[in-house]
């Protein structure tokens, strides 16, 4: 959609046809400002907020300022867009967009930022969009202590909160998956660059992305019947 966001009388015109074929604009607004929004037709707006002291000015971040990277490897490859993460300035907010091909995993190795096992505390939400209306993904929230372990089936338009622990995502085959992350917590300004902490049980995978998976059929001997 196309939207005009007015901050203290100054208009900012932003538009995006779809999360699947265009990059976003982000308008950062500190506390104490008057904000109005006017949409030229149907539009979807993501609004995230976090406590702030107003150290930074109003600023419109454009797609050319946002770093893009391909993370992971093998069946856990995905594309991450640093929509509002360090070094782009904000007090507490961190924003990512992530694109996961159908059949792939994201957030792998699983990581945490809930204040446990040496991590810093950040709250996080996921907003999901699916390229096909029937598509779905699996979102797991769990802790090593097993006081939390839930698997959620997520579909287009679902919003998921991360109450703590690790939170990997698996896109079903054929289900190209997008999600928007808002994070905020103890990390302020440049501290927002501090990374999460990986699950020690699965951290080894970062050194083994190129290890070949099984080649099928498995070599169980020449006398094994084959279909």
Annotate each predicted stretch with a short phrase.
Residues 2-227:
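Jelly-roll (double-stranded beta-helix
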């Amino acid at each position: 959609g196309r939207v005009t966001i007015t901050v203290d009388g100054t208009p900012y015109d932003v538009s995006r046809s779809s999360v699947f074929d265009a990059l976003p604009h982000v308008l950062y607004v500190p506390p104490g400002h008057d904000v109005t929004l006017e949409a030229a037709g149907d539009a979807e707006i993501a609004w995230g907020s976090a406590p702030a002291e107003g150290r930074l000015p109003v600023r419109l971040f454009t797609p050319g300022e946002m770093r893009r990277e391909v993370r992971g490897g093998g069946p856990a490859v995905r594309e991450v867009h640093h929509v509002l993460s360090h070094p782009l300035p904000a007090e507490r907010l961190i924003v990512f967009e992530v694109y996961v091909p159908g059949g792939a995993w994201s957030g792998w190795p699983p990581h945490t930022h809930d204040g446990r096992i040496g991590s810093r505390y950040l709250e996080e939400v996921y907003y999901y969009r699916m390229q096909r209306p029937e598509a779905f993904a699996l979102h797991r929230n769990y802790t090593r202590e097993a006081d939390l372990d839930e698997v959620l089936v997520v579909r287009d338009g679902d919003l998921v909160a991360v109450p703590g622990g690790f939170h990997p995502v698996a896109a079903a085959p054929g289900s190209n998956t997008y999600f928007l992350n808002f994070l905020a917590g103890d990390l302020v300004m440049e501290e927002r660059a501090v990374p999460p902490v990986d699950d020690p049980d699965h951290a080894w995978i970062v050194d083994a992305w190129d290890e070949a998976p099984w080649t099928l059929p498995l070599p169980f001997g020449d006398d094994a019947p084959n279909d």
